[in-house]
């Protein structure tokens, strides 16, 4: 005998239809639209960046650009009377929004999940470097996209620390900052304890070139 197909109740039909509709919506969504948390910089992250940048009440020139407060871009004539630390803090927080958006967009575009302290480390890099490191062909960005867990501590530290040049020159202050950011990214430590575990070698060509 051939069995008749089981009849579905109306509630079951509605549940099945809803489930199929939801599955279709999820299938049509791009990968970056799936749930990825967005972040803002933590209080600890802000303090760390301010420590890196140092405070200047008046505008100063660095590498052809003008800055004030905690390393915030400005025009040389913007603040003729200088600014207070409180004003500098607000200027930096306003500027951080741009860096936060850049990092959040990277995370959403590639469905990358990170912790708060990893986000803070990337925002610190972006505030200092701009977006130049956010290129998939560059190591750190590529590691994030392909899965940072696949790489060793040394590989991650080297990928971050390579961003230590001003022009063609290595700056020790940038090396130290990158090592702090790398340690924060890996271990969530906002203080200066970790980078003592790292050693770097700076080759000087003494007038020649290093290959």
Language-model regions: role of each:
Residues 79-110, 114-134:
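Alpha-helical segment that forms one wall of the substrate-binding/catalytic cleft
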Residues 61-81:
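Substrate-binding/active-site groove segments that recognize
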Residues 48, 67-69, 121-126, 155-156:
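Structural recognition of the beta-strand scaffold that forms the well-ordered cores
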Residues 44, 63-65, 117-119:
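Extracytoplasmic
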Residues 28-37:
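Sec-dependent signal peptide cleavage junction
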Residues 7-19:
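Bacterial N-terminal signal peptides that target proteins for export
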Residues 20, 24-28:
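Hydrophobic core
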Residues 36-57, 72, 86-89, 93-94, ...:
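Long, amphipathic alpha-helical surface segments
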């Amino acid at each position: 005998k051939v069995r008749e197909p089981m009849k579905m109740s109306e509630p079951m039909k509605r549940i099945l239809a809803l489930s199929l509709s939801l599955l279709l919506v999820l299938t049509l969504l791009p990968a970056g639209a799936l749930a990825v948390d967005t972040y803002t910089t933590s209080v600890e992250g802000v303090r760390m960046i301010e420590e890196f940048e140092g405070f200047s009440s008046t505008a100063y020139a660095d590498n052809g650009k003008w800055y004030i407060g905690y390393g915030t871009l400005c025009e040389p004539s913007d603040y003729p009377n200088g600014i207070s630390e409180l004003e500098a803090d607000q200027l930096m927080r306003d500027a951080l929004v741009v860096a936060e958006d850049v990092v959040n967009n990277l995370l959403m575009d590639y469905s990358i999940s990170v912790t708060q302290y990893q986000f803070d480390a990337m925002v610190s890099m972006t505030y200092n470097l701009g977006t130049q490191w956010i290129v998939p062909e560059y190591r750190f960005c590529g590691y994030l996209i392909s899965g940072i867990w696949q790489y060793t501590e040394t590989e991650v530290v080297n990928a971050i620390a390579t961003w230590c040049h001003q022009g063609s020159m290595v700056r020790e202050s940038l090396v130290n900052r990158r090592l702090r950011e790398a340690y924060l990214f890996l271990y969530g430590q906002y203080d200066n304890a970790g980078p003592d575990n790292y050693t770097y070698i700076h080759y000087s060509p003494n007038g020649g070139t290093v290959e």
